[in-house]
Amino acid sequence: MLEKLDSLEEKYDELTHLLSQPEVLSDQARFQKLAKAHSALSDIVTMYREYKSLSRQLEDSKEMLVEEEDEEFRQMLADEIPQLQEKKASLEQELRILLLPQDPNDEKSVIMEIRAGTGGEEAALFAGDLFRMYSRYAEEQGWKIEIMDTHYTDIGGIKEIVFVVDGRGAYSKLKFESGVHRVQRIPVTESGGRIHTSAATVAVLPEAEEVEVAIDPNDLRIDVYCSSGPGGQSVNTTQSAVRITHVPTGEVVTCQDEKSQHKNKAKALRVLRARLKELLEEEKNAEMAGTRKNQVGSGDRSERIRTYNFPQGRVSDHRINLTLHRLESVLEGRLEEIINALIAHYQAERLKQVD
């Protein structure tokens, strides 16, 4: 591990030197490329330097403890050494995590899809709750939400919503949200006061760049129609809604939220590109499926990942046996505790495999 860290530190110093050279400063494309590489190494090199400094301090303290005759000073050193050892072990663990191969999609924006599952109108109302939860979380993170397509029910629930969460690192935090989310509560439509169980499915796709997924226009069938609102009534007399079918894969994307057919087509292609990227990555990772299953869920949309229990005011994530008794604040978008716990668990699983 130390050899690898020494090599990264050397590379970082080399990049620092290059970034100050006139020939690099005058070439914006090269400067940006080198600056990005420099920034990517910054955290791990800073931590490694702290680790080396701490290691030297620990060795010095051990030597002084052997040589020192003053009892009071010896006691101070004896108290300090375990603290330094604990901090060194903690930094070593953090460095091991930083050395793990990064998910190339982690820094990307995401396209999220929420669909009401079993439970009729109640499931659609819950899908709306999930969308509000993610919207508030995104707002807290400083990310932007852009709705691509929405289908409402008669009482204002959401049958299906597709939206972009635009912000650096969105995928690294939201990728663990893929799966089935279950709700247990007394529906507003229930007169008998009985608790019902409903579900909604969430899919999280890293946004794909045009250069990553080339789409042949000849592979597309594009249909246009009038957009509709709650209950199916027409809300637009012009044919602005767009349905794109990717014939080779059978993937279908609809978009009707914009008044312009051109804008709806552009949004639908954006979603289609992300779905095709996911299909390509699923094929590529097929051999690794067993490994992924042993980690924090598989990202499988059919996997039940979390339950929101209203009578008990709790949220339970079934992948890591985490239960929080603050349902209301979670639905207000305060997801950081759950997401951080999932990331930590995932990293620990990956470290086990490396070991």
Swiss-Prot record:
Keyword Protein biosynthesis listed: yes
PTM remark: Methylated by PrmC. Methylation increases the termination efficiency of RF1.
Annotated compartments: Cytoplasm
Pfam family, one: RF-1
InterPro entries found in the cross-reference section: PCRF (IPR005139), Pep_chain_release_fac_I (IPR000352), Pep_chain_release_fac_I_sf (IPR045853), Prokaryotic/Mito_RF (IPR050057), RF-1 (IPR004373)
Origin: domain of life: Bacteria
Keywords, alphabetical: Cytoplasm, Methylation, Protein biosynthesis
Primary role: Peptide chain release factor 1 directs the termination of translation in response to the peptide chain termination codons UAG and UAA.
Family named by the database record: Belongs to the prokaryotic/mitochondrial release factor family.
Name of the protein described by the UniProt record: Peptide chain release factor 1
Gene: prfA
